């Protein structure tokens, strides 16, 4: 996994794009640390979104979009994970994926299911770009393939 601070987000992010990136980071943090949604959301709103941290300027993000993603993923995880599991092969099982990759796929799938006002291409491209910001290997291709397949089933 590449260090996000050492790489640039592939395209200039708007506030929703920044919210997606922050949501993936927050979901990762919640998975690793075990913190809750409200605690994590408050931390991001107070100390991260749009803030300067150790010389790095975090992007200004749409806080409501960020909150909807992290809240939705946590609430719907028991429905999201089986759907993702069906799309993954034995060597890429959900439990074997890197935590950040799981966060990317969960957030993207939640958005595909729940935000039908956002075009499929936007969701797929944004989360593939997020994957590219963290990974240099095949992971972005995996994100693209899984989301493309899921979108065809969810958004007929």
Curated annotation (Swiss-Prot):
GO MF annotation list: RNA binding
Q: Which Gene3D superfamilies match?
A: NusB-like
Tell me a GO cellular component: cytosol
Q: Which domain of life is it from?
A: Bacteria
Among the record's GO biological process terms, what is one? transcription antitermination
Q: Does the keyword Transmembrane helix apply?
A: no
Entry keyword set: RNA-binding, Transcription, Transcription antitermination, Transcription regulation
What SUPFAM superfamilies does this protein's entry cite? Answer: NusB-like
Cited function: Involved in transcription antitermination. Required for transcription of ribosomal RNA (rRNA) genes. Binds specifically to the boxA antiterminator sequence of the ribosomal RNA (rrn) operons.
- Which HAMAP family does this UniProt record tie to the protein? NusB
Record-linked NCBIfam families: nusB
Q: Which family does the record claim for this protein?
A: Belongs to the NusB family.
Q: What is this protein called?
A: Transcription antitermination protein NusB
Query: Gene name, please?
Result: nusB
